[in-house]
């Protein structure tokens, strides 16, 4: 009886694919009638947007990449770019760094929540409004339910450990408190978490400016706390986040710099970028070692001049940078430490529409990489292929362990990370691996054709 040897090599942290781009984050509207779409794989300028915002904005599409609606935190526009029913008078502000963020209600495909933040430590603080997409082009059914005031101009969202619910997170004003509201099938705020960590954010109101972002795996947060020559925090900090409890901890300062505003994690979660109002784009290697070593890893990626505004990870695995210009800048290889990240200034044209300082604010799980298996290499009768993934370990202070369960489709399994498996018969096999970690579970499938004699092997995504 012939044997067919299939050597399966699991390569952690090396390969991510963004082959399936259509999804909730593939259409962006921002600035003065500016926008881009990723539906073709690469960013293409949109010219049908109607909003005009200097900073904050949020957009949402369905899983097929069809636009649903977008907002500057004040007004909601439906997919045909008209005013959504009752979509006016929200309590965000177009001059708030992260004026809004949109999350779908768990378990209900028709209900979305728009969370808004007031600008300049305004009295409206953090509120939420409800959108029902089962009614025509959508309808705002409730508005401006206040959750917290005063607050910084910061909003981000992270998936809960149960892979269903969502944490929406902001930073209070006048203290070092993070507030995280749970969004579940019962609605908003059935559970709220408060955490005290990091710097106290107070003084001049400009300290409230700047982005708050979550790493792709939801286990790290980073925040820029803006400032000016006359005062303010002028710091970028990084924190641990527990997606099971909503608790934020271990806040540390990476850097002090005038005018820090935009911040973003690389797709693999190992590199951090931040920008300033003088036009500096900075990078840190979060896996450099100790805190001091991470701080010392800082690299100046660009000094192209003002202004580095919002920095946003895209669904294509690149990072986009708002520059208050009719073009965006892009970091083409954001997982690469140093100048090899390939920053390209003002290289994404916006059809002569001003992009201003903001980019759409997405929940971290709406811009997750898709895991797609590469084609195998064949050496004699041995087939080598990779089941790649990229789970961020957070690097700073975290040591996350993963377990693996392989099913080779012939009744045999393995819990090794890098197993070797021999098939006794030719045929077609459904191979899968499930990777489990703290608050994460990912299953990757592949259909494997094992031919007689092991001469040729073809793989295709299941």
Residue ranges and their predicted role:
Residues 11-16, 56, 125, 175, ...:
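A generic alpha-helix preference that emphasizes hydrophobic side chains
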Residues 6-7, 114, 139, 432, ...:
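Detector for intrinsically disordered, low-structure N-terminal pre-sequences
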Residues 20-377:
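Beta-propeller fold recognition
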């Amino acid at each position: 009886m012939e044997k067919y040897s299939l050597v399966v090599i699991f390569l952690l942290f090396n390969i991510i694919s963004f082959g399936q781009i259509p999804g909730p984050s593939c259409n962006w509207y921002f600035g003065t009638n500016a926008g881009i779409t990723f539906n073709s794989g690469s960013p293409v300028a949109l010219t049908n947007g109607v909003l005009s915002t200097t900073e904050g904005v949020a957009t949402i599409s369905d899983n097929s990449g069809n636009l649903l609606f977008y907002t500057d935190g004040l007004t909601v526009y439906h997919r045909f770019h008209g005013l959504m029913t009752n979509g006016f008078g929200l309590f965000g502000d177009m001059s708030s760094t992260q004026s809004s963020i949109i999350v779908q209600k768990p378990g209900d495909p028709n209900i979305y929540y728009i969370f808004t933040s007031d600008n300049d430590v305004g009295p409206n603080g953090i509120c939420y409004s409800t959108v029902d997409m089962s009614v025509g082009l959508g309808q705002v059914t409730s508005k401006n339910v206040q959750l917290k005031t005063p607050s910084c101009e910061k909003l981000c969202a992270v998936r809960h450990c149960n892979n269903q619910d969502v944490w929406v997170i902001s930073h209070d004003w006048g203290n070092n408190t993070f507030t995280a509201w749970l969004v579940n099938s019962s609605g908003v705020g059935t559970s709220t978490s408060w955490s005290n960590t990091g710097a106290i954010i107070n003084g001049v109101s400009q300290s409230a400016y700047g982005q708050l972002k979550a790493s792709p795996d939801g286990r790290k947060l980073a925040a820029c706390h803006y400032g000016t020559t006359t005062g303010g925090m002028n710091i970028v900090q990084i924190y641990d986040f527990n997606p099971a409890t909503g608790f934020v901890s271990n806040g540390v300062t990476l850097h002090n710099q005038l005018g820090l505003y935009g911040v973003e994690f690389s797709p693999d979660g190992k590199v951090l970028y931040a920008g300033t109002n003088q036009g500096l784009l900075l990078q840190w290697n979060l896996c450099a070692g100790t805190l001091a070593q991470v701080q010392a890893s800082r690299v100046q990626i660009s000094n192209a001049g003002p202004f580095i505004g919002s920095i946003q990870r895209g669904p294509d695995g690149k990072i986009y940078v708002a520059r208050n210009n009719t073009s965006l800048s892009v970091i083409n290889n954001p997982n690469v430490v140093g100048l090899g990240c390939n920053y390209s200034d003002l290289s994404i044209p916006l059809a002569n529409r001003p992009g201003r300082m903001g980019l759409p604010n997405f929940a971290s799980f709406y811009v997750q990489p898709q895991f797609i298996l590469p084609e195998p290499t064949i050496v004699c009768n041995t087939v080598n292929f990779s089941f790649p993934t990229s789970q961020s370990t957070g690097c700073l202070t975290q040591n996350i362990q993963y377990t693996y369960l392989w099913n080779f489709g012939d009744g045999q399994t393995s819990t090794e990370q890098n197993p070797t498996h021999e098939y006794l018969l030719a045929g077609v096999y459904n191979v899968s691996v499930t990777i489990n970690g703290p608050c994460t579970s990912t299953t990757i499938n592949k259909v494997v054709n094992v031919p007689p004699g092991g001469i040729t092997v073809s793989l295709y995504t299941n």
